[in-house]
Amino acid sequence: MSKRRRESDESDASTRKRRQDSSVGPVDRLSSLSNELLLHILSFLPISSLSVCQRLSRRFSALSGDSELWKRQYYTQWVRPRARRLASVRRSSLPNKSEYSPKVSTWLDHGHLAADGKVTNWKGQYRLRHNWSRGSCRLSEVEFPPRPYPPVLAKLCAGIVFTADADHGLQAWAAKDPAICLAKVLFSKGPESSKICPTALAVSDLKGSQEIVVGFENGHYNRYIMETETSQLEFRSCHKGSGEEAVTAMAISSPYLLMVSHDKLLSLHHIHPGKTSEVRELASLKADNVIAPMTLSLRTSNSEIVATIVYSFFHIGCGWSLGIQELHFSKTGQQLQSRLTSTVDSQYGIRPLRNLPSSTKRRHSTMADPRGQSETEVPVMPSILHQQPPTSMSYSHPYLLTSHADNTLTMYLVVSNSNDLFVRGGQRLWGHTSSVSTVQVTNRGKAISVGSRGDEIRIWELEMAIPSLGTSRPFNEESSIQVNPENKEEDLDFDSPSKRSRPEDRDFEIDSDLEQDFPSSQQCVGFDDERVLLLREKTVGTQLLECYDFT
């Protein structure tokens, strides 16, 4: 007869078994899987988990950094939400098969990333967009010589910053490192050897090169070509403008050039491609009511050229308003039509009568109801009232953006079709804590605004404001992002010249007696997908080119 096992013996055995199991540790069920299976599993993880996986081992670091994983994350975070937003604005629906597609050429406004032979670092691209969405960047500065008169002109195009002033001529700088001067050409190569001041600058991006046009105070303008591959800046030709006074504004869309002189003469020119100096004036018009600030725009199609001039004027009812004149030319320079509109109706909250002839619209003092059922009286008081002229304006079709001294911006949507030209709605944009000195907007609705003190730069996505146009629904500060350089306080000290980059050929000393506090002025040189460049006058005789890098 067998003896019964004691209960104490059984408990001891179970305890030893648990200890053995605990010494083995958790079972690793992932390392034995193939890379294909692991990539499929990682594709379901959020960004925070992918970042953790990169710190586990070399294998997981390589797998979690796979470009296709980040490409899908990029699409989910940035591409698809924008497509949904635009579909709701246009009152359309997305196709049923609008899920992720590996073909970047099918993504909205991402064709530049699908160029032949171009390999995109999707993790870096995701980081770039993430930094833009949070305003995170690094700030670097380049100090320029004492401010000449007129001040330095600057433009950003295809990763190159072009500056123009009377002392140093036309210079090209690398946007990645603005302290590096790529090329330089003095203005004395023109027919007049005397020093003249540049008053306007325009740049157009060509295949493998950039075309630069500089306008001067004597009404002349010079043409230059910058070869991207060799970084050679070459003077091409000098021409006399249509006006007798200084060139005040220019817009270029090669091979066409639009310019305005100080005597309010608007002229359109055709620039012959190649190394020849032939420039033909296509049209010239005299303007009587153009008041600064103003902006020019030039668009081309297969059949016509559309030149647009936006200017400010005072309206007795709603204060300072904007006038928009659109001129249509054929390729030979024949004027096809001229159309004029303003922002007055939008400032009153009136929707345009698009179904009536333009002559009938001017005779009507009432406005048809949006549903077409009845007529509504024109409001007595405007919803948008500006007592002071705009401090700056920017127009990139269809977006028109102005800045004001009352800490606000105003956005308009310009609609131009074969039958009509009108402004759809107007929306005040809030978020700045001081007067806004300058704005720039792209045709995709991305905008940069700079406060008058220079320490507040905000990023706007104006596509999000389209649904609120013409309504009382505000577009608040939460809809914009303030740029916050990570290294501004720790690396940069405006009072310490030793902490600023300075080009070698621009070494100079500033008299300490002149260093006193003055209101800073700034000019937004431009921005692209990776950076914002700002030209700022900090103190007397001190000009800084600031580069805000989001990479």
Spans of features found by a protein language model:
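Blade-level signature of beta-propeller repeat domains, shared across WD40, Kelch, NHL, RCC1
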Residues: 522-551
